[in-house]
């Protein structure tokens, strides 16, 4: 099957690697070339802000596959190689070394890059103690600077910022976290969940300052290091290390230059195809119409990358892909496991199951009577049950969700019975 067809995958992150190995597992017999500008063996990214930063994981433990697995599966890994252009007429990608690779199918798994802090240009961006956290090199540089009693300023109150703050506190650093928003995790959680995490971090020793805008930096006399962070309210924060995490920009430039449709991501259809049917896109860079939510989304998560990669492998090998599953995310901070399923945008009320005073609760986001999303804190069973509620769009009784005397599995069973009798 497809013995003479060439697949070129641009991007050696999780999505790209999973497409390559998924194709082989699904029976693809043609050539598979995996091209990326990273010079290291493809690796997992989430542990960079957690176990790896804390010194509890090695670089080797992060490998997506062992180095010899690529050759064993006849997958050609071209690391340290940038794709500079796509020639759609010739069905070729042009590499930075001048070579051209033919393709019958092209998969763009270009991922994203950290959103730059506008005031961190010039010498600031080149300073060794000012970092974003996206690559293994970033994590290694930061890990070397997690020194007890040193001062860390974290800019950004999203998952990355909070995870880095938690790791640094455990390393006995003095940590200040700044966020322009009125609360941490404002974009993704309800106010009570934000309040829980703000309290958690403050109790651990993090100085959280919301509604705070960074306006500049002070540099050492040799312009090699940041020495202080300056805020619009006049605050000056001395710093030995500064880490910024204010979001991700999808890497769409290659697609845009090739004339593909781009709109906050590379636009794809239900078959994972871009505006050119021979070119597909996957992962953080891909924007698609969600059947679950009936709107266009671009999802930055490991589970989404895995699901889309498997879908591409199935489609290219002539198999039926799985239906869309509810997207989910996770974040580990201190000893607390936050797992989230669904997309909460558009919710009009929340229902809390459990007590927000303890690290053991779930928060249901509803639009009318429909559950859009659920945040669970240290409740893995309810997390898995919530995935079923959202993926299957079960008509659960909202008034029972907050009643812990009624097991969630009974609420789900009643909803299934209602569906089957309808």
Curated annotation (Swiss-Prot):
Q: Which domain of life is it from?
A: Bacteria
Q: Per the record, what are the reactions this protein catalyses?
A: 2 reduced [2Fe-2S]-[putidaredoxin] + NAD(+) + H(+) = 2 oxidized [2Fe-2S]-[putidaredoxin] + NADH
The EC number of this protein is 1.18.1.5
Sorted UniProt keywords: FAD, Flavoprotein, NAD, Oxidoreductase
Gene Ontology terms, MF aspect:
flavin adenine dinucleotide binding; oxidoreductase activity, acting on NAD(P)H
Family, as annotated: Belongs to the FAD-dependent oxidoreductase family.
Job of this protein: The oxidation of camphor by cytochrome P450-CAM CamC requires the participation of the flavoprotein, putidaredoxin reductase CamA, and the iron-sulfur protein, putidaredoxin CamB, to mediate the transfer of electrons from NADH to P450 for oxygen activation.
State the name under which the record lists this protein: Putidaredoxin reductase CamA
Originating species: Pseudomonas putida (Arthrobacter siderocapsulatus)
Lineage, broadest ranks: Bacteria, Pseudomonadati, Pseudomonadota, Gammaproteobacteria, Pseudomonadales
């Amino acid at each position: 099957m497809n013995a003479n067809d060439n697949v070129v995958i641009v991007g050696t992150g999780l999505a790209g690697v999973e497409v390559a190995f998924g194709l082989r597992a699904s029976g693809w017999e043609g050539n598979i070339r995996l091209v990326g500008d990273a010079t290291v063996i493809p690796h997992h990214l989430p542990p960079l802000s957690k176990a790896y930063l804390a010194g509890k994981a090695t670089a080797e433990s992060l490998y997506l596959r062992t180095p010899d697995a690529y050759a064993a599966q006849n997958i050609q890994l071209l690391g340290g190689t940038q794709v500079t252009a796509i020639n759609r007429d010739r069905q070729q990608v042009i590499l930075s070394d001048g070579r051209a690779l033919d393709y019958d199918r092209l998969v763009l798994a270009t991922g994203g890059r950290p959103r730059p802090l506008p005031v961190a240009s010039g010498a600031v961006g080149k300073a060794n103690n000012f970092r974003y956290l996206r690559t293994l090199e970033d994590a290694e540089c930061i890990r070397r600077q997690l020194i007890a009693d040193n001062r860390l300023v974290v800019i950004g109150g999203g998952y990355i910022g909070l995870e880095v703050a938690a790791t640094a506190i455990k390393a006995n650093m003095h940590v200040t976290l700044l966020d322009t928003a009125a609360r941490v995790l404002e974009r993704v959680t309800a106010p009570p969940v934000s309040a829980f995490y703000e309290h958690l971090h403050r109790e651990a020793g993090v100085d959280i300052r919301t509604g705070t805008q960074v306006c500049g930096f002070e540099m050492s006399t040799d312009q090699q290091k940041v020495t202080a962070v300056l805020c619009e309210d006049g605050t000056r924060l001395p710093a030995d290390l500064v880490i910024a995490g204010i979001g991700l920009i999808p890497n769409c430039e290659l697609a845009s230059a090739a004339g593909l449709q781009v709109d906050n991501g590379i636009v794809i259809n239900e078959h994972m195809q871009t505006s050119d049917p021979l070119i597909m896109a996957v992962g953080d860079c891909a924007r698609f119409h969600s059947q679950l939510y009936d709107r266009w989304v671009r999802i930055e998560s490991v589970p989404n990358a895995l699901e889309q990669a498997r879908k591409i492998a199935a489609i290219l090998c002539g198999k039926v892909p799985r239906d869309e599953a509810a997207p989910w995310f996770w974040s580990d901070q201190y000893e607390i496991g936050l797992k989230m399923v669904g997309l909460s945008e558009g919710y009009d009320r929340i229902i809390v199951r459990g007590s927000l005073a303890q690290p053991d609760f779930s928060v249901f986001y509803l639009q009318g009577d429909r559950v859009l999303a659920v945040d669970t804190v240290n409740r893995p069973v309810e997390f898995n049950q919530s995935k079923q509620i959202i993926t299957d769009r079960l008509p659960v009784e909202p008034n029972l969700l907050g009643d812990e005397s009624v097991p969630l599995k009974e609420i789900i069973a009643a909803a299934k019975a209602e569906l089957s009798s309808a």
